[in-house]
């Protein structure tokens, strides 16, 4: 891969960095003030104002790669996007990761990005006009309902939500949780994964359907806190689906029994987008740590001069650089060979990025002493948010298993040779 940014990439990085300096960073205290006033689950005016500015600046729908322009169902839908490659998008997502809520300003936040790609690749023209267009215009938001509290959802074949055919409708029954974004008053639609045929082959039982959030039987049971943070105004919910009826023609994505296929196509880009933003969050934590250490004295000298902190700072810089390069490699592989071929790189970065950032944020918390565990410096909330990414879109253990099995597959001949020798000795 070429480490030199393309002219377009350089231009967008400069433009986005300038937008952050001029608009995002000054808006942080305004965002916090508006968030603290009154109802928690509400639209924040500062975000809506910034969306208009971002759209006018051409910093809109940056996430949608050219590969998303090869839909399996409909290829007539037109949308506004610069159509960046994953590699071109990577440094932009990293910048967005510096302020946790900023990706929404550019219409690049999860779970909407993944849902928009699903609609583009697998939706009918009618589904796109009804849901994708307002999503890409930033008029509504969405949710993805997959994880369930009653089963180990890291194995998607365990999903128990039932999607039963009843004439021209589906009737949906199930319980989901960690349904991100449901608390947002703009959340109008969800993509739900469940089973349409429990007797089919294991990976052909699941389907994905589109469900309006105002459909009768969609019940938000509770909002789930993350280490005490409610993540308002978007949040994560437990949702019960009780006899929810949706028309088959309007709801079904791609076809019955193809939900697992859609999920695999959706989660690859989503995973790497998270990892790109994580690098930005880690950079902020390192900056805060260095600034704190350079201004505090203990035992007669600045804390930054203590050898233990020099080691931690050096390790943080090395780990950030390594993770950034692995991000770029995964993005480049996705662009050149496709998500399936880039499976190893995606799995590696999904394990590496959150663990890297959590270590740096934890060191930054330590550098701030008691203040680090308060909300005064933003480190505790950053830690809480990134800790969820060791679970979201597949836990570390699942991705590590993928890496290990692909590594061990290189030694299949050796294993066969050993078994043959053992069999020979037995004879």
Where are the regions a protein language model picked out?
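Alpha-helical interface subdomain recognition
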Residues: 1-100, 109, 122-127, 134-139, ...
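N-terminal glycine-rich flavin-associated loop
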Residues: 104-126, 155
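A short, Trp-centered hydrophobic/proline-enriched beta-strand micro-motif
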Residues: 138-147, 192
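Short Gly/Pro-enriched turn/cap motifs at secondary-structure boundaries
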Residues: 150-154, 181-185, 198-200, 227-235
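Flexible, small-/acidic-enriched active-site or ligand-binding loops
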Residues: 158, 214-245
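Short, surface-exposed charged micro-motifs
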Residues: 160-162
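A short core secondary-structure module
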Residues: 168-169, 173-221
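Long, acidic (Asp/Glu-rich), low-complexity accessory segments flanking structured domains
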Residues: 243-261
């Amino acid at each position: 891969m070429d480490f030199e940014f393309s002219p377009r990439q350089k231009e967008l990085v400069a433009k986005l960095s300038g937008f952050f300096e001029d608009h995002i960073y000054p808006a942080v205290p305004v965002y916090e003030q508006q968030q603290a006033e009154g109802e928690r689950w509400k639209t924040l005016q500062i975000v809506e104002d910034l969306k208009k500015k971002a759209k006018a600046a051409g910093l809109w729908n940056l996430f949608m790669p050219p590969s998303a322009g090869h839909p399996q169902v409909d290829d007539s839908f037109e949308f506004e996007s610069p159509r960046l490659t994953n590699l071109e998008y990577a440094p932009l997502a990293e910048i967005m990761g510096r302020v946790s809520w900023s990706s929404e300003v550019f219409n690049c936040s999860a779970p909407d990005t993944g849902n928009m790609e699903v609609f583009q690749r697998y939706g009918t023209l009618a589904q796109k006009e009804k849901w994708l267009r307002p999503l890409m215009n930033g008029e509504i938001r969405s949710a993805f309902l997959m994880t369930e509290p009653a089963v180990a959802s890291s194995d998607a074949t365990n999903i128990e939500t039932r999607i039963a055919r009843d004439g021209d409708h589906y009737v949906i029954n199930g319980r989901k949780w960690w349904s991100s974004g449901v608390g947002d008053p703009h959340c109008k639609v969800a993509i739900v994964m469940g089973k349409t045929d429990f007797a089919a082959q294991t990976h052909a039982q699941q389907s994905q359907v589109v469900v309006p959030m105002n459909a009768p039987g969609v019940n938000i049971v509770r909002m789930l806190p993350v280490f005490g943070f409610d993540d308002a105004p978007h949040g994560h919910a437990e949702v019960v689906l009780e006899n929810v009826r949706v028309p088959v023609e309007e709801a079904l994505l791609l076809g019955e029994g193809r939900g697992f296929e859609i999920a695999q196509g959706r989660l690859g880009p989503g995973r790497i987008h998270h990892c790109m933003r994580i690098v930005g969050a880690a950079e902020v934590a390192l900056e805060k740590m260095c600034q704190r250490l350079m201004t505090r004295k203990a035992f007669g000298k600045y804390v930054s001069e203590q050898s233990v902190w020099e080691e931690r700072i050096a390790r943080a810089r090395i780990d950030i650089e390594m993770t950034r390069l692995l991000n770029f490699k995964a993005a480049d592989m996705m662009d050149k060979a496709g998500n399936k071929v880039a499976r190893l790189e995606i799995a590696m970065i999904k394990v590496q990025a959150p663990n890297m950032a959590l270590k740096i944020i934890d060191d930054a918390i330590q550098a701030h002493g008691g203040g680090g565990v308060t909300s005064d410096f933003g480190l505790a909330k950053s830690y809480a948010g990134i800790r969820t990414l060791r679970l979201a879109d597949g836990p570390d253990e699942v991705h590590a298993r993928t890496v290990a099995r692909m590594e061990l597959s290189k030694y299949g001949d050796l294993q066969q040779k050993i078994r043959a020798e053992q069999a020979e000795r037995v004879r």
